[in-house]
Amino acid sequence: MRPSDLGPGLFLGDDVQIGEGVRFGVHVVVHAGTVIGDGCELQDGAIVGKPPKLARHSAAAGRTVAPLELGAGAVVCARAIVFAGARIGAGAILGDQSYVRERAVIGAGSLVGRGTAVDNDVVIGERARIQTDVYVTAFSVIEDDVFVGPGACTTNDDTMSRHGPEYALRGATLRRACRVGGGAVLCPGVEVGEEAFIAAGAVVTRDVPARAVAMGVPARVVREVGEADLLERWR
């Protein structure tokens, strides 16, 4: 790690690749091997390419990670942390104090809100909107144009760590253009169908069909999303 005159207080690891027109805030740290595309912005205190440090019993322990890749025009906001092995698409925005783990993939034009945590091995599509203080658990899939409201939480372990090494963690699957309200909880392995709507505060314990509106604790389907609310009407 060495200081660089490309930004005030900037530190760069070995073999970092920096594209044209990249802007650095104050006290940014770029770890070894990180690839930063043209026109990216790394704001004050951002840490990118951080190597993961895992507990001895972590399900992710022992796996190698590739360098972090930031696509052209991606923005890493103030004090965000992005691990090595993640891939951030062109024009994506990672909000202040957000946290993106190794092997996470975030598609072009997506937003990860302030303080949101995206765990390891998560796949987020293009143009997704993940709001403030969301927890996206490991092995979740969030498809294109999904909206997740503030404080929503996904989970992936029914046993809460009372399992052997052969146990497969199961994150949530959020299909294209579905919407999840603020404070909703999605239990391990649930799938929310295309254009479905999960009300704020719902606890989703089973799959929700495409275009269904579900609410309550536990969540129950109460009606169907109307034609006027489909994404194509709001492009």
What are these regions (language model features)?
Residues V221-R235:
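Short, basic/aromatic-enriched C-terminal tail that caps enzymatic domains
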